[in-house]
Amino acid sequence: MNYDVYGTFSSVTGPNSPLNDACAPSGDQQGSAVSAVAAWTAAKFPANKIVLGVPAYGHSYTVPQSTAVTGTTLNIYTAFDKVNIPIGDSWDPPTTTPDICGNPPVGNGNSGIYNFWALIGDGFLGQDGTVASGMVGLFDNCSQTVRP
C-alpha cells in the first residue's frame, strides 16, 4: 500500500502516493512505491507476492500564494495552514469527533480529501484527467504524480 505518504498530518505538502522519491530532497523522502518494493524484496519477501495499491484520491491544502509558487512553478514541498484545511469533495463532511485512535480532528475538522471523480466533477481536472483550463498544475517527474 502506498497511500497517504503526505497529508494534513504532515509538516509540508507533498505527493499523496509517490511512485518514486529518490530524487526528492533528502528531508522529503518519506517513502514511495519504489522504496517500499525495494525494502520488502531486500527483506526476502517474494517479489511475485507483492501487490501494490495506489489511491484514487488526493489531499487539498490552504497554501499562501507567496509560498505556493516560485516564478511560475508550483512548489511541491511547502508549508500549509494546518488550521484552515479546505473542505474536500461531497463525501468529506467536517468532523469534531476524535478518530478511532482517540486523536482530535486536525485543524477545523475538514480532511480536505478529494476522490478522483470529484477532481473531475469539481473542475480541477478535465474529463481526460489532465489539469483543467484555468488551473495551475504540473507533472512531477520525480514522484511521477500530477499536482493540480
Predicted region positions:
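Hydrophobic, secondary-structure "cap" segments at the distal end of domains
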Residues: S90-P148
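Substrate-binding surface in catalytic domains of secreted glycosidases
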Residues: M1-V106
